[in-house]
Amino acid sequence: MGVESVERERESNEGTIPAEFIRSENEQPGITTVHGKVLEVPIIDFSDPDEEKLIVQITEASSNWGMYQIVNHDIPSEVISKLQAVGKEFFELPQEEKEAYAKPPDSASIEGYGTKLFKEISEGDTTKKGWVDNLFNKIWPPSVVNYQFWPKNPPSYREANEEYAKHLHNVVEKLFRLLSLGLGLEGQELKKAAGGDNLEYLLKINYYPPCPRPDLALGVVAHTDMSTVTILVPNDVQGLQACKDGRWYDVKYIPNALVIHIGDQMEIMSNGKYTSVLHRTTVNKDKTRISWPVFLEPPADHVVGPHPQLVNAVNQPKYKTKKYGDYVYCKINKLPQ
């Protein structure tokens, strides 16, 4: 199918990168990163028996940062290690084998290998690209899983991802409950507002091969996630950056922690109480970075808006209410919401 591959670009342009990967000066990480300082976003012990304390920590981190890391989340380290191992093995396969899972051109689904989400940014005659290859799979609920796009090699890919999804489901249930309670709502309110048991878990494996000029390129351009919440597992290669007070900082890597991003739909449902985090990804000259974000998304036809219990004469709705699919269409195509 001839899927575009950054790995192929790297092999054919040793020591340099093509112009379409070189960002403008106001984006280049070599210029825009605050060097020598790693941003220590809040670290939250998810096993703390003091629920009131946990609610306060989650609420403050979701409001002030939009990003935090949770530890002691009860997902066994071996489950995370297996998830990482099978993802890495897939991307190390020959290009032709990976392309067997490419998204068909006429498919309405995002799932598959080598898919792109956002329209690439055009500057003059040059279309800018991120230094990254992708694989998208829906992993929960079982009713939306399409094994057509799940790699059969390595053979343990399915088992590792299903095991991770099962454990992640428990984390999601608890996190949504705490986020609801932090807004003064009943524990199930935000989950219901996001689609209830039909909330979809979209796994995206980001594969960032070594880049000869990491000072000029980005893996993923600055953005906020469209999801309600994104739960991310990185490998140990630095790359995640967050924007704080208008400046870009590396986010500290913590082994076996889950990185939480508040997404656009959570900001909307909370009527602005929780903040969708602006973040981006840099790349490394010598090492491959891989990350496993799971986007928790409402079904496309599910209507999302500020939660009715958070809106009154004093607190007017700050966001429009619309189908999630319409929101996605507008954001991908850079149309007004």
UniProtKB/Swiss-Prot annotation:
Fe cation binds at H223, D225, H279. Its main location: cytoplasm. The keyword Iron applies. Pfam families: 2OG-FeII_Oxy, DIOX_N. It catalyses: a (2R,3R)-dihydroflavonol + 2-oxoglutarate + O2 = a flavonol + succinate + CO2 + H2O; a (2S)-flavan-4-one + 2-oxoglutarate + O2 = a (2R,3R)-dihydroflavonol + succinate + CO2. Keywords: Cytoplasm, Dioxygenase, Flavonoid biosynthesis, Iron, Metal-binding, Oxidoreductase, Vitamin C. InterPro entries: DIOX_N, IPNS-like_FE2OG_OXY, IPNS-like_sf, Iron_ascorbate_oxido_reductase, Oxoglu/Fe-dep_dioxygenase_dom. It is found in: Cytoplasm. Coiled coil: none annotated. Its cofactor is Fe cation; L-ascorbate. Pathway: Secondary metabolite biosynthesis; flavonoid biosynthesis. GO terms for cellular component: cytoplasm. Residues 198-298 form the Fe2OG dioxygenase domain. One of its GO terms (molecular function) is flavanone 3-dioxygenase activity. Belongs to the iron/ascorbate-dependent oxidoreductase family. Catalyzes the formation of flavonols from dihydroflavonols. It can act on dihydrokaempferol to produce kaempferol, on dihydroquercetin to produce quercitin and on dihydromyricetin to produce myricetin. This is Flavonol synthase/flavanone 3-hydroxylase. It comes from Malus domestica.
